[in-house]
Amino acid sequence: MHGPKPTVKDIELDLAPEAVPLVCNEQLDSSDEEDCIDVVEPAQQAYRVVTLCTKCSTTLRLVVESSEADIRAFQELLLRTLKIVCPRCA
């Protein structure tokens, strides 16, 4: 904007990032490089989990949202050491 009074035509709306050359021996921050990489999140899906309370054998129903890989890991935990108890037994 130039002059004593700004006008609408003086406002520049094109704000594209500009390429700036690196100074000698300067390196990009790793966070700048990570911003340029598109990370694809695994698809989340709702899963119904039916299991038994380990103390009183009451049927427990859970709904969880997870990726397919994570729900398989959850299943492995349930088959091994992870035990879920009902609110009454907790």
Swiss-Prot record:
<dbReference type="GO" id="GO:0030430">
    <property type="term" value="C:host cell cytoplasm"/>
</dbReference>
<feature type="zinc finger region">
    <location>
        <begin position="53"/>
        <end position="89"/>
    </location>
</feature>
<keyword id="KW-0945">Host-virus interaction</keyword>
<dbReference type="GO" id="GO:0042025">
    <property type="term" value="C:host cell nucleus"/>
</dbReference>
<feature type="region of interest" description="E7 terminal domain">
    <location>
        <begin position="1"/>
        <end position="41"/>
    </location>
</feature>
<feature type="short sequence motif" description="LXCXE motif; interaction with host RB1 and TMEM173/STING">
    <location>
        <begin position="22"/>
        <end position="26"/>
    </location>
</feature>
<keyword id="KW-0804">Transcription</keyword>
<keyword id="KW-0862">Zinc</keyword>
<comment type="similarity">
    <text>Belongs to the papillomaviridae E7 protein family.</text>
</comment>
<dbReference type="GO" id="GO:0019904">
    <property type="term" value="F:protein domain specific binding"/>
</dbReference>
<keyword id="KW-0805">Transcription regulation</keyword>
<keyword id="KW-0553">Oncogene</keyword>
<dbReference type="GO" id="GO:0003700">
    <property type="term" value="F:DNA-binding transcription factor activity"/>
</dbReference>
<dbReference type="GO" id="GO:0052170">
    <property type="term" value="P:symbiont-mediated suppression of host innate immune response"/>
</dbReference>
<keyword id="KW-1121">Modulation of host cell cycle by virus</keyword>
<keyword id="KW-0899">Viral immunoevasion</keyword>
<dbReference type="GO" id="GO:0003677">
    <property type="term" value="F:DNA binding"/>
</dbReference>
<keyword id="KW-0244">Early protein</keyword>
<dbReference type="GO" id="GO:0008270">
    <property type="term" value="F:zinc ion binding"/>
</dbReference>
<keyword id="KW-1090">Inhibition of host innate immune response by virus</keyword>
<keyword id="KW-1078">G1/S host cell cycle checkpoint dysregulation by virus</keyword>
<dbReference type="Pfam" id="PF00527">
    <property type="entry name" value="E7"/>
</dbReference>
<keyword id="KW-1114">Inhibition of host interferon signaling pathway by virus</keyword>
<dbReference type="GO" id="GO:0039502">
    <property type="term" value="P:symbiont-mediated suppression of host type I interferon-mediated signaling pathway"/>
</dbReference>
<keyword id="KW-1048">Host nucleus</keyword>
<comment type="subunit">
    <text>Homodimer. Homooligomer. Interacts with host RB1; this interaction induces dissociation of RB1-E2F1 complex thereby disrupting RB1 activity. Interacts with host EP300; this interaction represses EP300 transcriptional activity. Interacts with protein E2; this interaction inhibits E7 oncogenic activity. Interacts with host TMEM173/STING; this interaction impairs the ability of TMEM173/STING to sense cytosolic DNA and promote the production of type I interferon (IFN-alpha and IFN-beta).</text>
</comment>
<keyword id="KW-0238">DNA-binding</keyword>
<keyword id="KW-0863">Zinc-finger</keyword>
<comment type="function">
    <text>Plays a role in viral genome replication by driving entry of quiescent cells into the cell cycle. Stimulation of progression from G1 to S phase allows the virus to efficiently use the cellular DNA replicating machinery to achieve viral genome replication. E7 protein has both transforming and trans-activating activities. Induces the disassembly of the E2F1 transcription factor from RB1, with subsequent transcriptional activation of E2F1-regulated S-phase genes. Interferes with host histone deacetylation mediated by HDAC1 and HDAC2, leading to transcription activation.</text>
</comment>
<dbReference type="InterPro" id="IPR000148">
    <property type="entry name" value="Papilloma_E7"/>
</dbReference>
<keyword id="KW-0479">Metal-binding</keyword>
<keyword id="KW-1035">Host cytoplasm</keyword>
<feature type="short sequence motif" description="Nuclear export signal">
    <location>
        <begin position="71"/>
        <end position="79"/>
    </location>
</feature>
<dbReference type="GO" id="GO:0006351">
    <property type="term" value="P:DNA-templated transcription"/>
</dbReference>
<keyword id="KW-0010">Activator</keyword>
<dbReference type="GO" id="GO:0039645">
    <property type="term" value="P:symbiont-mediated perturbation of host cell cycle G1/S transition checkpoint"/>
</dbReference>
<keyword id="KW-0922">Interferon antiviral system evasion</keyword>
<protein>
    <recommendedName>
        <fullName>Protein E7</fullName>
    </recommendedName>
</protein>
